[in-house]
A protein has these predicted regions:
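Beta-rich accessory regions
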Residues: 7-18, 24-259
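Short, small-residue-biased leader/transition segments that mark boundaries at the very start
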Residues: 1-2
Length: 259
């Protein structure tokens, strides 16, 4: 049996990050379609600054189809069983971000593995986002650029990034197009990835942070983004920011994750 794409010139990405590859589905999950991707990139997988391992699997995701603007897409939502890993919970009351809003300590016992679950109302803001950072100033920026309809994750200052200078581009990427389509491109590791989004009033965002990764799931997995990061110590502080107006964080829970 031969399958042909009805739109060979249209790419619908399952994940918009740099480090989602070789997705494998399980065959014994009943009516559910559950997949696990490899979390790395052939551009730099052999030179990442790790000792005990070179790569790992990302979180298992449940795949499903949905329709948007008369187009069919594949969503990838974290499987609900991940909730059993939640240990400590920190619930932060609703707040408005007019310029910035600081959270000086995310979790009391933070070893670098946690989940952030947020519900956001856009308001008048053009840019709305937050930085996860540590005492050394290493940070990851995650933000919505609403005029350009983009969700962005910027890891250019996330920690150890200089090994990216030795990245080897894929054969199809030897031209410079990847440099112009990325945001804040420094090299094939130090950059920002982005996903197209619909401009909506409310967004639900799940962010999973581990010792060397950040995985984003927007609106139940309609957008997923997986990126490696290598901070020298866990991100335990947070700063929300806005430009062009304010936005509202209606719900915000932080969970320490563990076995």
């Amino acid at each position: 049996m031969l399958f042909r794409s009805s739109q060979p010139n249209v790419t619908k990405w399952l994940d918009w990050g740099k480090d989602h590859y070789a997705t494998v589905c399980f065959s014994n999950t009943g009516e559910r379609t559950i997949a696990v991707p490899w979390m790395s990139n052939w551009q730099y997988c052999n030179i990442v600054p790790t000792k005990q391992f070179r790569s790992a699997n990302a979180l298992p995701r449940e795949l499903s189809l949905y329709t948007q603007d008369n187009e069919i897409y594949l969503s990838a939502a974290p499987v609900p069983e991940i909730k059993t890993l939640r240990k400590e919970k920190k619930e932060i009351p609703a707040f408005t971000v007019a310029n910035d809003y600081h959270i000086d300590s995310l979790l009391a016992d933070n070893d670098g593995a946690y989940e952030l679950a947020l519900e956001i109302t856009a308001g008048e803001a053009e840019i709305m986002g937050f930085s996860l950072f540590n005492d050394k100033g290493e940070k990851v920026d995650i933000y919505f650029n609403l005029p350009e309809k983009r969700l962005v994750m910027d890891r250019t200052k996330s920690g150890i990034v200089d090994f990216g200078k030795k990245s080897v581009p894929h054969e199809i990427e030897v031209h410079d197009r990847r440099k112009t389509t990325s945001i804040n491109y420094i090299d094939d590791f130090a950059l920002a990835t982005w996903a197209p989004i619909k401009k909506e009033n409310k967004y639900m965002l799940d962010v999973f942070v581990d010792k060397c990764s950040v995985e984003i799931f927007l609106n139940g997995g309609k957008v997923a983004m997986t990126n490696l990061i290598f901070p020298s110590e866990p991100y335990n502080r947070m700063c929300f920011y806005s430009k062009g107006g304010s936005f509202q964080v209606d719900s915000f829970n932080a969970y320490r994750l563990g076995l």
